[in-house]
Structure formats: structure tokens, C-alpha cells
Amino acid sequence: MLQSLTVRNFKLFDEQGITIAPSKITVLIGANGSGKSSIFQALQLLKQNAETVHTGAFQYNGHELTLGSFADVIHNQATEQQVEISINVPYENLPRLEYLTPRVSRNGVYTYTINLMTGNNYSQSCTIHDDHQTYIAVKQRRRPEVTPDEFSFAEGSKIKIEATRIAGRPMEIRLTQSTDSHDNDATISDILMLLSTIQVQLSTSRFTPAIRGFDQLNYEIFSSGARFTDGNNALLRSRALANLIAERPDIAEEVGQKIQQVLGAGSRTLRNRLAGDRVSPEMGLGRKSITLFNEAFGLNQLIPAMVDLVTADQGALVAIEEPEAYLHPRAQAALADTFVEFALNEHKQVMLTTHSEHILMSLLGGVASSRLQPEDLAVYELYREGDTARAKRLAVNQYGQIEGGLREFMEVDIEKVGELVASRFR
């Protein structure tokens, strides 16, 4: 799970930057244009580059998102500066690491940092560490530095660590193995799991964009089978979703059940209809069906987010922009309850951007009822400060209260209620 994210000189964030420490559920609130989506985009950029395996040239445009160029993302277009994106991801229960010489702790944190520069250039670094010491450090400057660059184990077996120029994959290993044994295989497996910590975190992360849903009656059937499509391309995502619903009735059934919990939609089911080389996603009630294109727009918008939540791996980050889109307040509150279920029962890390007081209040209610612990819910308020944006974590107490209140988030309701009361006594 993602332990922390730091972003500097990226879009609205200046050199001071922001640091987010996600919990089981993390809520980002703030006015329009305060940088909430930029936090997701920073992570998507890392995911995009770690998966495309380009060496030496950072990709700002790809399957995840299209941001233009370095000049489009550097704060205030100050191209002499560098963007910094850094993530901390914990690893745990890798006991064979302690058989290495020098020893590496079985539990620790993998810190990865990338610095973006003009001309699609970048440098990256990483450390494997715990609270007491650093076990491995990789720095890429004019000449890569790896400390230590070699580990031994068993009798004569060695691992050489080398720095790479692949974004998101800062190091690789070369193995010299003297003998084959079960213990050696277990040691190598733990080493590979350690070195893949960042790649696994990024590759399993799911991002549900604000622009989503089915905008056609039917979609072309994939010739090579259904596959999920990440990224912010609404057409590609909706086509992939339509195919996934058709080929994976188990996923369609679970998504349908979750939607019923949110909307109170009775015994309706998520299914599909095939016509030639086209597939039409539908909601069914008995023998009757309605294409999702013609369904309630809130339902249309809800399905992509719910598919991301259902199909994500345990421990994966699922980041959803504006999950409340077109939903009734009661449905928004019920949706917050499903977020709690995914976080607690399926151990998925849920992160939201939202303007919905109903979602936030429902999550705070989960803390008040002891369903969530205060540390399970992280609430960050993003706000403008001149030409930059800041992020402030709002403390949640055991009663589900935000210490200091939520005036900035709730002030419109407060003002309008005040106006209503005042008008009553004119």
C-alpha cells in the first residue's frame, strides 16, 4: 500500500510542494482548481512510464494520460526547475533477506524518487530502509552509484545490483548462483519481490477519471478477448468495460450487487447483449433490459468506478475522481459505505477527490460508530496560496469530528441556511 506521496514543482505545486500520507481511505477536498486531480496525475505519470519501459526519455503522453510536455507540467512554466515525485511503499515479511550479506531487514520501506527535467530528461534514485538504517541506495547522476552493489548468500552465490535508466525501475540484478536449492530459490524470490515493490504498487493502482461512462449504445467486440483498459481515454475505457462485462459474468454479477447496495435498485442485474461484432452493456430486470447508454446517468457514471474497485488486487490503490457524480444524496451516503467495505474487508486502499459533504459525512460517521478508526480515514484540504497550492491534513477524532471544523467545505450550506432563517423573520 502507498505510504506517502511527495510532489514538488508539478503544475500548481511549487518547490515546497505537498506530501500526502494515505490511509485506508483518503479524501481530498478543496475548491475547483486547488490541485486535487494533479495528485492523481503525478501517480499516473509514474505508472505510465513504469509500464511502457522507455529508457532515457520520460513519457508525458501515453495510455494513462496526455499532459503535453515538460513545459506544460512544470510549475509556472519555469523550465529551468525540476519536477520531483517521490513515493514510499512499505514491504514486509521477506525473511530470506536476512540471509544476505550484508543483511537486509525483512520489513522496511522502499523510497523511490524521480526528478523530471526539460527535454524529456530525468534522473531517479531509491533507497531500501527502515527506521534504523539504509540497506540499499541507488543514485543516478553523471555516473550511477549503488551502495552496496553486491550481496552474497549461501555458498558462493552472489547478487550484483545495477542502476537502470528505466523510469520506475531504478535497479536490476545479476545473479551468480553456485548451487540450486530450495533455500536459494526462496532467497532469490524474496529479493525479486523486494526489487519489484514499486512496479507492483504502480501496476496494480487503478484510476477512475472524472470523464467516464458509456456514451454509445454498443461497442466493438475485442478479437483477442476482454482486457481492462486504464487511462483517461473515455472511449477506450468504455469499450473495454463493455467487453469485460460480456466475458466475465462473475465480475458483472459482483458489480451489479454493489450497485444495488448504492442505488437500492432491487433485483436488477448488469448484463450484455450481443449483435454481430458489437456488444451492448445493459441493466436487466427479469426479461426486460435497458442499455446503459439510456439508463440513469448516475448509474452510468457509477459502473466504471465500481469495476475498478471490484477488480483491483488486495492492497492496491483505487483512486476515484468525483465518485458522487449525478448521484442522489442518499446514494452518495450509501456509496461511502461501500468504500468502507472495500477498505476493511478487501484491504483495498481507496482515495477520492470529492465535493460531496454526503460522502465525507458518511465516512466520518463510520469513525463515530467505530466501524473505522480515526487513523483509517485521512482527510486533506487543498487550497490556493497565490499562484501555488497547499495541502493540509485535517485531524479526525474518535467521535468522527474534524478538529477545527470544516467551515471552508461547508460554508455555502451555512451561509444559505443563515439566509433562509433570516428571511423567515423579516
Ranges and model annotations:
Residues N9, G17-I18, A331, S356-I359:
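Helical "lid/switch" subdomain of P-loop NTPase nucleotide-binding domains
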Residues I74-Q77, A333-R426:
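C-terminal lobe/lid and adjacent interdomain/linker elements of RecA-like ASCE P-loop ATPase modules
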Residues S4, A50-L302, D313, N397-R426:
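Phosphate-coordinating catalytic segments in nucleotide- and nucleic-acid-processing enzymes
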Residues A325-P329:
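ABC ATPase nucleotide-binding domain "signature" loop
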Residues G17-S23, L309-Q314, F342-N345:
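Phosphate-binding P-loop
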Residues M1-E51, T55-V73:
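Pre-Walker A-like glycine/lysine-rich segment at the N-terminus of P-loop NTPase domains
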Residues L43-N49, D308-A312, V340-F342:
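Walker A/P-loop NTP-binding motif
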Residues I320-P323:
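Walker B catalytic motif
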